[in-house]
Amino acid sequence: MVSVNLEAKKTVDVMIEKQDELNIAVSQLSNGATIIDCGVNVDGSFKAGELYTKVCLGGLADVGISIPGDLSEKFALPSVKIKTDSPAISTLGSQKAGWSVSVGDFFALGSGPARAICKKPAETYEEIGYEDTEADLAILTLEADVLPGEDVAQYIADECNVDVKDVYLLVAPTSSLVGSIQISGRVVENGTYKMLEAIKFDVTKVKHAAGIAPIAPIDPDGLKAMGKTNDAVLFGGRTYYYVESDENDDIADVAAKLPSSAADGYGKPFFDVFKEAEFDFYKIDKGMFAPAEVVINDLTTGKIYKEGYVNVDLLKKSFGVDN
């Protein structure tokens, strides 16, 4: 079976080779681990955001950036485009922020291929029937405001049972260009996550997927940046899923439940919802983490289902746009 770490390494190699033109910084820790700073002490770039997102997806997706004019006649934003023919593995088996990395004073949400080696969390990999058993290296992306040290790299190496010199850690804060891009790049993953976690649908039946979401404006306030980046998907994300159903599946019901607008807490910017939940993710309805608009093509029946909608008014409210 394909190795998400070995596939992602191809993109990591490009980032290392082109670090200057990408406005990123590559360094090596004293224990040999490689750190790729994509936004902590550097500016990053659009292209760095594309490549970072592709690494998150285990190299199993095409990632691009464009400015579509159809989000709204009066409101166009640079947007991230995702296409994948391995949706379950690329999004849930790699991209999902499923590893809370806590070592000493360092904490970050970990995404990316290394999760598939040590199966974090194990339930996800049981559900999708995947594990990366081929890799002799570990690649993890970290959403953090500071760069990790030797102790963090050693922890990752130990968890993945690889030599620390074969650990690659990519870092971008939420309040950076690359950070904003990679969160919008989770537009497809938000849908597969909700299918699995909230709707309990077998995501291995999703054979192909595509999505697009606007890139949230960069905010130096980390909490506000987190709100805006989530809203980019919740209110502006559009996704397309190609599903191979069986006779027991109610795809119309899956489609109806999938958009963010189907969640109980829908209707406010995410920062407001998060604040009301006392900044505790676990108090927020899981159904909130979903794209705004969903189209499902049932490959078995030929039927197509469209649910949800782009909410430009809430997107503008979140981003602070007055007109």
From Swiss-Prot:
UniProt keyword Hydrolase, yes or no: yes
Cellular component GO terms, alphabetical: cytoplasm
Main subcellular location of this protein, as a coarse class: cytoplasm
An example molecular function term from Gene Ontology annotations: methenyltetrahydromethanopterin cyclohydrolase activity
Reactions this protein catalyses: 5,10-methenyl-5,6,7,8-tetrahydromethanopterin + H2O = N(5)-formyl-5,6,7,8-tetrahydromethanopterin + H(+)
UniProt GO BP: methanogenesis, from carbon dioxide; one-carbon metabolic process
NCBIfam families: one_C_mch
HAMAP family, per database record: McH (MF_00486)
Task of the protein: Catalyzes the reversible interconversion of 5-formyl-H(4)MPT to methenyl-H(4)MPT(+).
Assigned protein family: Belongs to the MCH family.
Protein name per its UniProtKB record: Methenyltetrahydromethanopterin cyclohydrolase
Species name: Methanobrevibacter smithii (strain ATCC 35061 / DSM 861 / OCM 144 / PS)
